[in-house]
Amino acid sequence: MSSGNPFDNGNPNDGNKSPSIDELYSPSESLARDGDDNNNNNNNNNNNNNNNNNNNNSSVSEKKKSKKKVRIQEEERLTESYDDDGDDEERRAYIENEEGEEEETEDGIILQPIVRDHSTYRPKNLYGSSDDIREGDSFGAKVSKTFGKTNKKIKQKIGESNKKIETRVKHSNKAIEEGWKTIAQTTMKPVDNIREQHHRRAEQHEVAERAVWFKDKLQIQKYECLDYVTIYNKAHRNELYKNFSKLASDHEVLRWIVSLFMGIFIGVIAYFSHACVSNITKYKFKFVEAVLELDLFLAFLTYFLLNTLLATCSSLLAVYYEPTAAGSGIPEVKGYLNGTKIPHTLKMKTLWTKFLSMVLAVSSGLQAGSEGPMIHIGAIVGNGFSQAQSKEFGFKIPFLRSFRNDKDKRDFVTSGAGAGVAAAFSAPLGGTLFSLEEVSSFWSIALTWRAFFCCMVATYTMNVLQSNSGSLTGLIIFNTGIGDKESYNWFEIIPFLLIGVLGGLGGALFTWINVKVTEFRREKINKIKSLRVLEVFLIIGLSTCIQFFLPLFFSCQNTAPFIPSVGNSTLTDVTLTNGAFYNSTIINGTFYNSTIANGTIYNSKFYNSSIYNSTITNGTGVSYDPAETLKELSEFKRFNCKEGWYNPMATLIFASYEESITNLLKVNSNNVTNTERLGLWPMFLFCIFYLFFAAYTAGCAVATGTLVPMLVIGASYGRFVGLVVYHILGDKVSIDPGIYAVMGAAAFMGGVSRLTISLTVILIEITDRLKYLLPLMLTVMTAKWVADALIHPLFDLLMQMKYIPYLELDQSKEMKLMMCKHIMAKKPVYLAEKDTLGNLRVLKETRHNGFPVVNNDEEKLVKGLILRTQLLMILERISDVYIPNSEAIYSHIEYTTKLTWKLPSVNDFNFDPADYSQEIDLSDVMNLTVITVNVEFAVSEAFQLFRTMGLRHMPVVNENNKLKGIITKKDLLEKTCEQRYRELNHMKLGIDQLIHVGDE
């Protein structure tokens, strides 16, 4: 091997030698880059290589040049980084790798592997000729060159060190990256499994949701919708023309007269229900207390038997006699006023069953109230009085025929529902607003005045009857003394807001429990009637045990601090306990632990009176009504305590709901401080007990409501918060737990029902203090906001669980992305203007209640719409249809009257097949004012048309008015649109593809 060129791998004189690396490249690209000491030798080698390169350059392709160039550049890198610390190993490995390359053939020239001797490598010369120190150099130049060499050497070492560090860092980073990849793969495997499981569960959930929706859809189909849209056809126009002068005045006067009688009748029913409940409850507790004086266990058996007997009888009525009477009836009334026809909801049979079941259930001690049934009863009264007819009793009054349509009936039902609330709470304005805010879906100014008038009459009737019977006014809330209370402190807004938050959370919990219980009943209990009765028996049995035995764990308290002093009074035939008297005349009185103050016995007159353990001392007293003292004494429950003492838990739980609310809302007065009359633990346990039992009881097989339990639960936790604040602040400020109880009652009721304005007005009316308007509104709004963030309102969820089609006030977000062609029925059943009798077989073949009427089968241009009920009447009076210009032709007023009474079934008609070809003209009967929309019409806007106008059917047409489909109320339900959007979203379409879904 020649020593002249370290890269030469053969005899230089051999004609078949392979070209060297330097022969393939120009001198500027060679590896000879040594210092000036080796320049001459390298130049000679380069010249020789250039000569050889010129001879063979034409036979080497540019591709191989590029490849060799890459190799040379790599060798340059290795040569420049050569040192004794390990880079030589890398260079040697590279050379051995190059020696292992296979032969390559290019254009007939065999390229031999290049063999390189690594021992000939020398490090690159660090210094150039300019760095040499010459004799003629000045001292400064010598110093500069010396430092320059040193600097270059230092830079070289630094560069070499940096390259080593960089190389090692690269290796470390690569190792770390590989390690992280290994860790990530190990970690992501379970994550991927979890993601896959989640995706699989999501698919299973979607399949389950779809199955549930199809099941719910079948349940929804059993309900029909009401016709709130007036049918304007030729027959109706003729009737309007004939009676045009009587249209406005007569009908409006009749509406006010009907509203008057509705209010009176609802007030009478409210009074009798209240009187029955009060008397049954009063005598029940008196009897149990009398037995309690004899034996505790015997008193429990008596209390248990009485409660279970009353509750079971109530359940038997609601299960076997009229099942529609069970529950509060509010979801059914809301659904009806939204446009859904619910069978048996407004029948007189339902009213009497509701009344009796409500009286028995509330008297039994169930955690339920009477206001919900009163709303339902008021709605039934509104329906019955407006129609002036009854199928059960078989009578009709002809002069109210003009109100026998769904639209007028809806208005009277709305007024009746509000009057039921007004009579229950003695709040006419609150009842009107409740009807507007909660149950009604369609409202007008004229309806507002009539509804308010009906509520005033119902409240006045109720109060007059109660005042004549010696009772206090109001069915739900009695005189609590709140009206005499001074205004609140500004810092109390903070605990009021806390009460609002707790009301929202508690209301959401109450709703969730009731929904879960309702689902359980629907799947396990409601299918068997006997189980429904057994459930009521178990509920009242367990509740009775807790009501009776829980007070035994609480100690007795003295009633003296909570009884006002009595002076300058005359009392006759009474029994007084722990009273203070002076200058009084007492006749036939009995005194226990009493104080007679201010003077000697000669200052007072006693006739046939007995004094036990009493003290006659000097003292002072104030004038006070003795009847009020008797009332105060009746609010305390002795239970197992001695005379003059009471049990705080029995005062709450061993009492009627009226007495419980009265004690909870009791505020301080000038004579008595009621802060400590009910302690913290009784408040807490009573709230928990009532919350869970009321949530479970609501919806069972008895006629009960939930509004009163909401008030009781809210008042209990509100008073509890007030007591906590009182114990924290002490006597520094005036804290009245009774005010906190009012705020709690409003908050919890708002958290469950989401009522705001009507609830605030009702509580303002029953407390008679406008100064609490601001804190009440803040508390109620806070409760509503918190509950809205957690769950839907209770009555809306109950309607969904009962499969009642209901259009909410606001449309869902999915509706804004869809068009009518996405949700419409694609193949609507239609009739022609002039059709045949045989084509009316669609009444038997389908369950549709509305049919678009087109001009003919070819063009299918929409001309109107006809209802199933109209076709049934045509079939019934088919002979009249063919008499043109006759009075016997289809009559609109007769149709509406027939509709509210009884129409024949399609199976009642049997026509001769020979008559099937007979032509029927529907142009005089069909509704000419049918509303149609284009296939591209937004679903959200179609929803607004249905919601505001009370539509039942909406044909869908193209730009030429050709029938393409039909939309009904059930197609616009929130769940329906969500399911349809989910199906479209599952297709993963863009907005452009989504627009064209449904096109032909």
From Swiss-Prot:
Protein name per its UniProtKB record: Chloride channel protein D
Species in which this protein is naturally found: Dictyostelium discoideum
Primary localization: membrane
GO molecular function, one term: chloride transmembrane transporter activity
Biased composition (Low complexity): 1-16, 38-60
UniProt KW keywords: CBS domain, Chloride, Chloride channel, Ion channel, Ion transport, Membrane, Repeat, Transmembrane, Transmembrane helix, Transport, Voltage-gated channel
Ranges annotated as biased composition (Basic and acidic residues): 71-80
Role noted for this protein: Voltage-gated chloride channel. Chloride channels may have several functions including the regulation of cell volume, membrane potential stabilization and signal transduction. Required for normal aggregation.
Gene: clcD
Family: Belongs to the chloride channel (TC 2.A.49) family.
UniProt cross-references to PROSITE patterns, sorted A to Z: CBS
